[in-house]
Amino acid sequence: LVEVQALVDQSSLGNPRRVALGLEQNRLAMLLAVLHRHGGIAVYDQDVFVNVVGGIRVQETAADLPVLLAVLSSLRDAPLADKTVAFGEVGLSGEIRPVPNGEERLKEAATHGFKRAIVPKGNAPKAGSYKGMDVIAVERLAEALEAC
């Protein structure tokens, strides 16, 4: 598990900055375009800074959804619900794709005290598998944004 932070702020420059620490720069640009196109949330006039806490370099696409939820949280100036975990690959058409080891990710999150999970529908466990954890299965980016 990794923590993803984001800061979104009004840009004073003609070209807003996109800074990604621990994440590929081009991936961030693509995710922001998907957020605009399929989530209806534009950040074209905002500076966007994303940081993976602890200096960890994230290579896998499972971090896509957490990145966009962190951006949304900063943009709204409101934190996600306490003890929320998320994972999922975000496709160019706004679909949330399953990722490898979904079951293991949920087990690990539960052992760390997470009470709410936003996951791809393809990674959703059977109902009641995780007592004490509300697992929200999503197929589209818009659904994930509504769950926040």
Region annotations inferred by a language model:
Residues L1-C148:
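Peripheral, non-AAA+ core regions of ATP-driven protein-machinery
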